[in-house]
């Protein structure tokens, strides 16, 4: 069974889901392991960690192999590498999406350097045969510079020498649906990548996926054709909650300042009447993340709804207050505080009008809220559909 490992600060989930989608549509039965759970042979179930603990991971991979899966695409988190969860796995291909400050402090990484060094291990310590990497990222050379495998596949939006070069990205909007069409140069030939999800960064994820698929023998034309109907639950996922209303609802996992900035900047390109952002932040983590989320949303959204995320043992009101401290009267957008996330979603549905884009950020495809150490059933998508149904 071939094993593809994908690491990076952002884009792991979407790139991995895209890669598995391409392989499955190309006649290579593939499984997925990552933040969105475990998926193979028509089976889907959740996992606690992005990269499961060692014994659990080995059990899952054994089940996949016994079910006829020929390739597994796995998100490899920095914590997974730090704690040795993937030790003993023989990776065929390893991929690097990008790097930015995150997961520093608390129970995660003590320093940025430690965070980077853990990710780098995927390229130096696991004997992979091929490395696929984002040549635009300033940490690319650090990550893959000492890679000893036989093959490297690069992707870029600026480096003409890259194996996959994104030369154009055009936003597309049809009703409540958002997409993006890209032009890609590969091996002297031009390809079109037409994705049913917004954002040039998703085109970069698509290039990562195409490179990973190529490492297993899938040609580029087949990869880009397969991506025309790809979906990634909770990753810039359009939810048609109010059909015919002209309102676009997006559920996305953006949970730090950089990811939220990227999401809101992309959505601005679709020229919404108003850009409404509903978000919170997790408990038990650095307050820097809360400040960054507030700073970004207060400047890039037209209206914000501050609510709970996974508060755990912290009071949601305290987390919301930390976020709200970044909103400056006269210099920021207006906002409301609604600690109950379901009620916050209900409010978002009630104020949305034709032409608006409403972003529910932070939880993505998660099916729970972590409250006082307990996973309470909750889904942004389900809450959105239920609240919308009640308004009809």
Spans of model-derived segments:
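Charged helix-capping and loop-helix junction motifs
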Residues: 113-117, 287-297, 320-323, 376-380
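Short internal beta-strands
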Residues: 130-135, 276-279, 302-310
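Short, flexible loop segments at boundaries between secondary-structure elements
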Residues: 378-392
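C-terminal helical cap/extension that packs against the catalytic core
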Residues: 246, 294-354
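Extended acidic/charged loop-beta regions that coordinate divalent cations
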Residues: 63-65, 69-104, 141-192, 225, ...
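Nucleotide phosphate-binding/pyrophosphate-handling subdomain across enzymes
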Residues: 186-303, 325
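Short glycine-rich anion-binding loops that position phosphate/pyrophosphate groups of nucleotides
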Residues: 78-79, 100-102, 137-138, 171, ...
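Phosphate-binding loop of NTP-binding sites
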Residues: 1-135, 139-150, 207, 271
């Amino acid at each position: 069974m071939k094993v593809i490992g994908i690491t990076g600060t952002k884009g792991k989930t979407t790139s991995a889901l895209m890669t598995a989608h391409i392989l499955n549509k190309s006649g290579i039965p593939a499984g997925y392991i990552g933040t969105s759970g475990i998926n193979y042979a028509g089976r889907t179930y959740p996992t606690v960690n992005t990269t499961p603990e060692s014994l659990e991971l080995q059990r899952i991979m054994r089940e996949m192999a016994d079910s006829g899966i020929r390739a597994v695409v796995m998100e490899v988190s920095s914590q997974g590498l730090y704690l040795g969860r993937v030790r003993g796995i023989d990776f065929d291909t390893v991929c690097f999406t990008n790097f930015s400050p995150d997961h520093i402090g608390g129970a995660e990484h003590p320093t940025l350097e430690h965070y980077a060094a853990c990710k780098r291990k995927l390229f130096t310590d696991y004997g992979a045969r091929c490395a696929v990497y984002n040549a635009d990222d300033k940490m690319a050379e650090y990550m893959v510079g000492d890679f000893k495998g036989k093959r490297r596949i690069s992707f870029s939006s600026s480096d003409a020498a890259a194996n996959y070069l994104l030369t154009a990205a055009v936003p597309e909007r049809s009703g409540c649906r958002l997409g993006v069409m890209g032009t890609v140069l590969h091996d002297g030939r031009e390809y079109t990548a037409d994705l049913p999800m917004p954002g040039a960064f998703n085109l970069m994820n698509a290039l990562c996926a195409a490179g990973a698929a190529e490492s297993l023998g899938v040609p580029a034309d087949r990869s880009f054709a397969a991506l025309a109907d790809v979906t990634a639950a909770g990753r810039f996922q359009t939810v048609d909650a109010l059909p015919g209303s002209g309102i676009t609802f997006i559920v996305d996992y953006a949970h730090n300042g950089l990811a939220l900035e990227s999401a809101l900047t992309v959505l601005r390109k679709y020229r919404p009447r108003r850009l409404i952002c509903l978000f919170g932040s997790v408990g038990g983590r650095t307050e820097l993340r809360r400040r960054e989320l507030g700073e970004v949303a207060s400047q890039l959204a037209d209206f914000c709804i501050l609510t709970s995320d996974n508060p755990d043992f912290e009071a949601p009101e305290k987390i919301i207050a930390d976020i709200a401290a970044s909103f400056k009267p006269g210099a920021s957008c207006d906002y409301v505080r609604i600690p109950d996330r379901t009620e916050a979603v209900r409010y978002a549905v009630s104020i949305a009008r034709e032409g608006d884009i409403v972003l529910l950020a932070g939880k993505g495809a998660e099916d729970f809220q972590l409250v006082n150490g307990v996973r309470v059933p909750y889904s942004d998508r389900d809450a959105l559909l239920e609240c919308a149904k009640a308004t009809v």
